[in-house]
A protein has these predicted regions:
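Structured loop/turn residues at secondary-structure junctions
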Residues: 45, 65-66, 158, 296
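Active-site glycine-centered loops adjacent to acidic/histidine catalytic or metal-binding residues
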Residues: 93
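Short, glycine/acidic-enriched loop or turn micro-motifs at the edges of active sites
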Residues: 96
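Short glycine-rich, flexible loops that bind phosphorylated cofactors or substrates
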Residues: 68-69, 162
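Active-site microenvironment of metallo-dependent hydrolases
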Residues: 101-117, 121-315
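Acidic, glycine-rich active-site loops and adjacent beta-strand->loop/helix elements
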Residues: 66-68, 130-131
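Histidine/acidic residue-rich metal-binding segments in metalloenzymes
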Residues: 1-62, 69-90, 101-115, 119-122, ...
Length: 315
């Protein structure tokens, strides 16, 4: 695609680091992908995928988050194959706030990897030094040495890896789970409270029109929580509107441009969502954070959408 290649070239000319997304790609396609200047990937779900990418010079972010957890699959084979870890890192690819409270963030990746047998220093390096080397930030970060920024975690031991002290810029900010440095209250900019630039909706806004008694529609089939595919479904039509089906687990799904208020939107169908609901709406979603509405009937979908308009976002 010429437009994509032009964008990649502009980023490389500006010295940018381009992160990749190579789910399901291998062989010649992966070689072509790497040749474009993309240096990393967080999508490998098994060791073979990790190894293929490492051999092509890529950096790998091993994912452990609310969407997928890949440490258990990958770390033991990294160890048994004595694979170098200097181009391995951790990432979450999205974490639920409740998971952060219960498990932690990248510190959780360190602890889990150590439990799986990874050397503690290698695990810490994958969470710090390797990342800064990848992003060309090693001059200032990634080690404790003269001339580097003093952003430091102090652990009690090398097994639990629970931070006892936290220094930011050389200043102690947390000690024994207590914030010891004053935190300035920053006023929320007004523009941040007015980001859902949408109109009020009625059920008519969620109609999918058809003149037949039945309609064959394209639908997004959720094979897993991550993998989807396009399928065809036959749905009933009432009063010129294609309706969802609880029996087939097919709901309506709509997406609206909440950021620019352009009135751009699309309405389709979603299979295997797995919830018998009136409607669900959210402005928190990967990656656009537009307003998504899922529902079994248009009236409830309009109510859910208007609720987010009133609250200026949320779920």
């Amino acid at each position: 695609d010429p437009k994509t290649m032009k964008t990649l070239s502009a980023m490389l000319d500006s010295g940018c680091i381009i992160n990749g997304h190579t789910a399901g790609v291998s062989g010649k396609k992966l070689n072509a992908y790497v040749s474009s200047g993309i240096l990393s990937c967080h999508e490998p779900t098994n060791f073979d995928q990790v190894l293929e990418r490492l051999r092509l010079g890529m950096w790998i972010m091993i994912r452990e988050g609310s969407i997928r957890r890949d440490l258990n699959e990958i770390i033991p084979l990294v160890l048994s194959n004595t694979t170098y870890t200097n181009r391995l890192m951790f990432c979450s690819d999205g974490l639920d706030p409740f998971d952060i409270i219960e498990f932690g963030h990248i510190d959780h990746c360190i602890r889990e990897s150590v439990k799986l047998g990874l050397n503690q220093i290698d695990a810490i390096s994958m969470a710090s030094k390797n990342c800064f080397d990848y992003y060309n930030m090693g001059k200032d970060l990634g080690g404790i040495a003269p001339g580097k920024l003093a952003d430091i975690l102090v652990f009690d031991d090398m097994t639990k890896m629970k931070p006892r002290k936290v220094f930011v810029g050389g200043k102690l900010v947390v000690s024994n789970n207590t914030i010891v440095s004053a935190i300035k209250n920053q006023p929320v900019p007004k523009w941040m409270t007015k980001t859902v630039k949408l109109k009020k909706y009625t059920e008519n806004d969620f109609f999918v029109k058809s003149n037949s008694d039945f309609a064959d529609v394209n639908a997004i089939n959720m094979k897993t929580e991550i993998i989807t595919e396009r399928i065809s479904e036959s749905l009933s039509v009432k009063k010129g509107n294609v309706i969802p089906s609880f029996d087939k687990d097919v709901l309506k799904v709509a997406a609206f441009d909440r950021t620019f208020g352009s009135a751009k939107h699309t309405i389709g169908f979603l299979k295997n969502f797995g919830a018998k609901i009136g409607a669900f709406a959210s402005t928190w979603n990967f990656h656009e954070n537009n307003m998504i509405v899922i529902g079994s009937n248009e009236k409830d979908m309009a109510i859910a959408a208007n609720s987010l308009l009133r609250t200026q976002g949320g779920m």
